[in-house]
C-alpha cells in the first residue's frame, strides 16, 4: 500500500475513529496509573482492520500518526516474528508487544477491542491469590462484566472468576498460556498475569473499557477485603 494511502487509514476528523480514540484512551488510562512508564497497550478492531498502539512509547503522548494498522483476519501473529501490516508509522516505532495476545481475544472471543494495563490493583490481586484464579462474589460492579467478555452481563449473585497465568520475561511469550487460560475459563472476561497486570476484552472499545474499569474496581475491593481478613466469596449454604 502506498504511503499516502496508508496514512489515510489513520487520518480522520471523526473523534470516534480508532486512530483518534486510541491516543485519547491512552491519556485517560495514564491518568489512572494503568499505562505509566510506557507500559500497557490497547487495540481496536473494526471490520477487517486492527488499530494498535506502538510499543515502548509514553502512552500519554501517543498521536494518531503513531498508530499501526494490521489486516484481519491473518494468521495469528507469532512471538518475535514479522507480521502483515496495512500501515506502519514513518518514525522508527515498533507495534505493541501485546499484539499476539490481542489476537487471542479476536480469535477466541471475537472481541472488537482488547486492553492491557499494569494496574497496581491487578498486580496486588495476583499476589494475594496465589492459585490459578481470582474470585469474588456479591459485588454490584460484577454486573458490569460480561460472560466471556462478549456475552450476557453477569449477575450480582454470580461469582466472578478470572484466571491468573505466570509472567514471562518477554510479553509476547505469554501468548500460549493466555490462550490456554481462555479455553479453560471460557466465561472469563480477562486474564490476569502474575506480578504484571491484566488483559481485558469486549465486543467494542466501550465494553472493553467499562469492563476493565469494573474489573479494576473488583481487584481493588478484593485486595482490601483480603487484607481486612474478609472472605471475597460468600458461602450461601
UniProtKB/Swiss-Prot annotation:
Catalytic machinery residues: 140
Single GO molecular function: zinc ion binding
A cellular component term, taken from the record's GO annotations: cytoplasm
Keyword tags: Amino-acid biosynthesis, Cytoplasm, Lyase, Metal-binding, Methionine biosynthesis, Zinc
Subcellular location as annotated: Cytoplasm
Cytoplasm is among the record's keywords: yes
Any GO BP: L-methionine salvage from methylthioadenosine
Function: Catalyzes the dehydration of methylthioribulose-1-phosphate (MTRu-1-P) into 2,3-diketo-5-methylthiopentyl-1-phosphate (DK-MTP-1-P).
Family: Belongs to the aldolase class II family. MtnB subfamily.
Identification of the protein by name: Methylthioribulose-1-phosphate dehydratase
High-level lineage: Eukaryota, Fungi, Dikarya, Basidiomycota, Agaricomycotina
Amino acid at each position: 500500500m502506498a504511503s499516502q494511502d496508508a496514512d489515510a487509514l489513520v487520518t480522520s476528523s471523526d473523534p470516534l475513529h480508532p486512530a483518534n480514540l486510541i491516543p485519547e484512551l491512552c491519556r485517560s488510562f495514564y491518568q489512572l496509573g494503568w499505562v505509566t512508564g510506557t507500559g500497557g497497550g490497547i487495540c481496536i478492531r473494526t471490520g477487517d482492520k486492527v488499530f494498535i498502539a506502538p510499543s515502548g512509547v509514553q502512552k500519554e503522548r501517543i498521536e494518531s500518526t503513531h498508530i499501526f494498522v494490521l489486516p484481519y483476519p491473518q494468521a495469528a501473529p507469532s512471538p518475535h516474528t514479522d507480521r502483515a501490516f496495512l500501515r506502519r508509522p514513518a518514525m522508527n516505532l515498533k507495534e505493541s508487544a501485546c499484539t499476539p495476545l490481542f489476537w487471542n481475544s479476536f480469535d477466541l472471543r471475537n472481541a472488537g477491542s482488547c486492553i492491557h494495563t499494569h494496574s497496581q490493583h491487578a498486580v496486588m490481586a495476583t499476589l494475594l491469590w496465589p492459585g490459578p484464579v481470582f474470585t469474588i462474589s456479591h459485588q454490584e460492579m460484577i454486573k458490569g462484566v460480561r460472560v466471556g467478555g462478549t456475552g450476557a452481563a453477569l449477575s450480582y449473585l454470580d461469582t466472578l472468576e478470572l484466571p491468573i497465568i505466570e509472567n514471562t520475561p518477554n510479553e509476547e511469550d505469554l501468548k500460549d498460556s493466555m490462550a490456554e487460560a481462555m479455553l479453560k475459563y471460557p466465561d472469563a472476561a480477562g486474564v490476569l498475569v502474575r506480578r504484571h497486570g491484566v488483559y481485558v476484552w469486549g465486543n467494542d472499545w466501550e465494553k472493553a473499557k467499562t469492563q476493565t474499569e469494573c474489573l479494576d474496581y473488583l481487584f481493588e475491593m478484593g485486595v482490601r477485603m483480603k487484607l481486612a481478613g474478609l472472605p471475597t466469596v460468600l458461602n450461601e449454604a
